[in-house]
Each structure stands twice: as structure tokens, then as C-alpha cells.
Amino acid sequence: MALVQLAQVSKVYRSLKGSDYVAVRDFSLDIEAGEFFCLLGTSGCGKTTVLNMVAGFETVSAGDIRVGGKPIAGPAADRGVVFQGDDSLYGWLSALGNVEFGLRMRGVARAEREQKARHYIELVGLKGQDHKHPSELSGGMKQRIQIARVLANEPQMLLMDEPFAALDAHTRADMQRELKRICAATAKTVLFITHDIDEAIILADRIGVMHAGPASKLKGIVAVDLAEAERERTHDRFVAVYRQVHEMIRDEVAIALQRTH
């Protein structure tokens, strides 16, 4: 059985004037335990809406979402969310304080939570930086602290909404490598949202391409059966997967552009 199951999921928003906006319609997807799944699509296609429903931040209008066979009833510790920016870090807390925050809220003893927090700070490559505050950290370091904070709560899966979008190209490439290393070390299931085809191929086991919104659903899935050495942009097999994904999303980009004019 898949760890995450979305069956015929729809999300409808109602405006103050009473009109309906269908963000997602009849969206179905299974994600296996330990899988890194990238959801790719144009701006406004409903990628974040899907993630928010899996996270439990938003309810479904129709359909069913299950994690570990159980219906989602709201946010829970089995699903950890890493956001795009660093606004979710508490500026008055050190890196250690940020990473252990969730454990402290759950009543974990100080010695245990500090030990666990330091373990995950080291795992994300920031050993010795635990005393620093967010204002003293670079953008990439802040994202690592976000990831460490989520991992410290030991969720079954990570939900990541374009977490590296605000980083410069060099830092973004570093964070992609670090994320792959961390996921290999922890065997976490990941749902990763992106609009970047290269990023999806570098990271994912499978890539799901969404139709352009509104009323979006999954258009198709591409398996990324590449060895690590083949995930370089210049490798022939990387280029072949890129073309396959690009062919699938090209028409959706055109549709999205038409709707903005």
C-alpha cells in the first residue's frame, strides 16, 4: 500500500460574492514510502493547494486523502512542512532553539530534545552553528535549519513547497545535493513542489506534471530512472528525461500564458 493516497480530490474556494473557483478537480496520486516525488506545474496550477491539503492546512471539497491508510483530519506530526522562505524561523531563538522548538512544545525533556536537535543540526551540515541566530545565517543555512527542525519531530514524510526558490543558483545547487544526502540518510518520503524541470530531475524518483489551472489535475507521471552520475544537466540521459517532461508541460505553459492576457 502506498504511504500517501489522494483519490479524486477536488478543492473549491468560494468568494465573498458567492462565486466558486475550482483550484483542483479529480486529482489522484499514490506516493510510495521512501519515495521522492516532485509535483511540477505552471504558476497557479494548484501545486501548493495539493500540498496544503496533504499537510492538513486545507480541507478537501471532494475526494479522499490518506497517509498510512488513515484519513487526514488536519495538521499532524507525521507530516513535516518546509516552507519557501525563512520567515518561519523564530528570530529571537538560536539555531538550536529553533530546531528543538517543536520538541519543547511536546514536553520532551531538555536533555533529550537538545541531543536530538544537535543530531539533526549536524545531519544538515551545520555542526558548531547551533548557537547562532537566524540573522547570523545565510539563506542556505536558514533552509538547513528549517529542514533540521522538521526532521527533529521525526515525521513520516516531508512536504516541501519550493523551499529553494529564493536562493541564488550556487546555493540552490548546494541545497539540492544536501537534500538528496539527507533523504538518503533518513529514508523519508518527500512531496516536493517545484516549477523547475532541472530541479525535479535532479531530485525526484518520479515527476508528476499538472495541467494548467484552474480545475487542474495530474496530466501524467515521468519516472526518473537515472543513476546519480546521470543526473548532471549535460548527460544524455538527463537531457532525454528533460525533453520528455518538457514535452508534457509545454502546452500547459502556453495555456497559462494565454490566461494571463
Name these PLM-found stretches:
Residues G63-P75:
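Conserved ABC transporter NBD signature motif
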Residues L93-F101:
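Short coil-to-helix segment of the ABC ATPase nucleotide-binding domain corresponding to the Q-loop/switch region
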Residues L158-D161:
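Catalytic Walker B motif of ABC-type/P-loop ATPase nucleotide-binding domains
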Residues A152-Q156:
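A short, proline-enriched helix->beta-strand linker immediately N-terminal to the Walker B motif
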Residues E100, R104, A111-Q129, R181:
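Conserved ABC ATPase "signature" region
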Residues L40-T42:
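The feature captures the beta-strand-to-loop junction immediately N-terminal to the Walker
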Residues A55:
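Helix-to-loop junction immediately C-terminal to a conserved catalytic motif
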Residues H133-L137, M141:
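Conserved ABC ATPase signature
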